[in-house]
Regions:
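Boundary at the C-terminal end of the N-terminal hydrophobic targeting segment
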Residues: 24-26
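Pocket-flanking alpha-helical
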Residues: 54-61, 71-115, 194-199, 213-223
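Ligand-binding clefts/hinges and TM-proximal coupling segments of bilobed small-molecule sensing domains
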Residues: 148-169, 249-312, 321
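Positively charged n-region of N-terminal signal peptides that target proteins for export
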Residues: 1-4
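Bilobed "Venus flytrap"/periplasmic-binding protein-like clamshell domains
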Residues: 37-65, 69-71, 129-202, 213, ...
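Bacterial N-terminal signal peptides
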Residues: 9-21
């Protein structure tokens, strides 16, 4: 499979096609009084991520058609990305995994210190596969081989979901508690996703939690020793049940895109979605959803994961989504017959669930401030207060 980088030839060809389609899109929306803002601000993960590369593929096309200045900002720290998007409102759209949105709403780890803010799904970005990777010459051949003392595990500290994946969910899959993992493994902390990946090929860690679709993964694949993926067999129901207790928004799957070494390996799918907030102009969200659907054939080849932005992928996401959808997107989906009464039912239920989490989380912060309790995820007094406020609220779970 070709390397997941935006090629200049593809981009040029896409812009040529765009010249013939932009007038049609504008004419379809003639008579609408909506005026695009001077700038559409979009946040993505690091520059070495497929999310950043693919967004830079379709962004210039949207700009050429609508006249809006599309600004794409990479932010590798997921907590900083959340704060800038939700609290500071620096962005209108953000590409983030469903796992991370779950953590940010439920106040896991570093998110517990941040104000809780409602988020809404706009469009499916990609169904990102994830798994655990070792160097090609590693002595570890199966995921169960990790169940021994002395294993060095990369710990990507900028991402709470990735930390949970390696410190808690991976041990659970192989039949350990997080305490047993802490007692037997050596965690190698790193501050960025790229560092997390390179620990394996550089020999600093034995195993890392990695997606096969990023440009950095293709660099790993090109290493003289290559890389190898430790399968998470779909037949291991005990392992998966334990894993999903800790990562309830992921989906067991078989990897079918990314680096060649990942093909056919049983692993995880954690969808990346373009998200917005309810306070963002929903007319603009409606037009974005319309553009994503109607212009799919024009932008689908700008990057390998852009093909995962089809209406079919969006509809499949909706069939399992744990999170509410933006009003503007719902309006468009209703127009094209892709939204049902059943969708309204589950969506309203998820809005109500998110409202419970947001209210409880923010009430905990308010009480902590009033009592001068230090708001920090390592302060047990604050965490106990937070648990008191959120006790009994169900977590967000993928609808199977």
């Amino acid at each position: 499979m070709k390397k997941l980088l935006l090629g200049s030839t593809i981009a040029f060809s896409a812009m040529v096609v765009l010249c013939f389609s932009s007038m049609a899109f504008a004419q379809q929306n003639a008579g609408k009084e909506f005026k695009w803002p001077p700038m559409l601000r979009i946040a993505t993960p690091t520059t070495q991520s497929a999310s950043f590369a693919s967004t830079n593929g379709w962004g210039p096309m949207l700009q050429a058609e609508t006249g809006v200045n599309v600004r794409i900002v990479p932010e590798d720290s997921e907590i900083r990305r959340y704060t800038r998007f939700c609290v500071n409102k620096e962005f209108d759209l953000v590409s983030t995994s469903i796992a991370d949105v779950g953590h940010s709403i439920e106040g896991e780890v570093g998110y517990s210190m941040q104000e809780a803010v409602h988020q809404r799904a706009v469009w499916h970005h990609n169904d990102t596969p994830w798994s655990f990777v070792v160097r090609g010459d590693s002595k570890f051949k199966t995921i169960q081989d990790l169940k021994q003392k002395g294993v060095r595990v990369a710990l990507s500290t900028q991402s709470p979901p990735m930390m949970v994946a390696v410190q808690e969910a991976l041990p659970a899959f192989i039949g350990w508690t997080k305490e047993e993992a802490a007692a037997n493994w050596t965690f190698v902390p790193v501050g960025s996703y790229a560092e997390n990946c390179r620990t394996v090929t550089d020999g600093k860690a034995d195993v890392a939690y990695v997606t096969p679709i990023s440009s950095i993964t293709f660099e790993m694949e090109a290493h003289p020793q290559k890389i190898r993926w430790l399968a998470m067999p779909l037949s291991d129901t005990n392992g998966w049940n334990a894993f999903l207790q800790l990562r309830p928004t992921v989906i067991p799957s078989t990897m079918d895109f990314g680096v060649p070494s990942a093909m056919g390996v049983d692993a995880i799918a954690s969808n990346f979605i373009y998200w917005t907030r309810p306070d963002v102009d929903q007319e603009m969200v409606y037009l974005l959803a319309k553009w994503f659907h109607e212009r799919f054939d024009n932008y689908k080849d700008v990057h390998a994961i852009a093909k995962r932005m089809s209406l079919n992928h969006m509809r499949n996401f909706l069939n399992h989504s744990a999170f509410p959808v933006a009003e503007g997107t719902i309006r468009y989906l209703k127009e094209i017959g892709q939204w049902t009464e059943a969708d309204d039912t589950w969506n309203n239920a998820q809005i109500a669930l998110m409202d419970r989490w947001v209210n409880a989380r923010n009430a905990a912060i308010k009480e902590a401030n009033a009592k001068k309790i230090k708001i920090h995820w390592e302060n047990q007094e604050y965490i106990s207060l937070l648990k008191k406020h959120t006790e009994g609220i169900p977590v967000f779970k993928t609808r199977m």
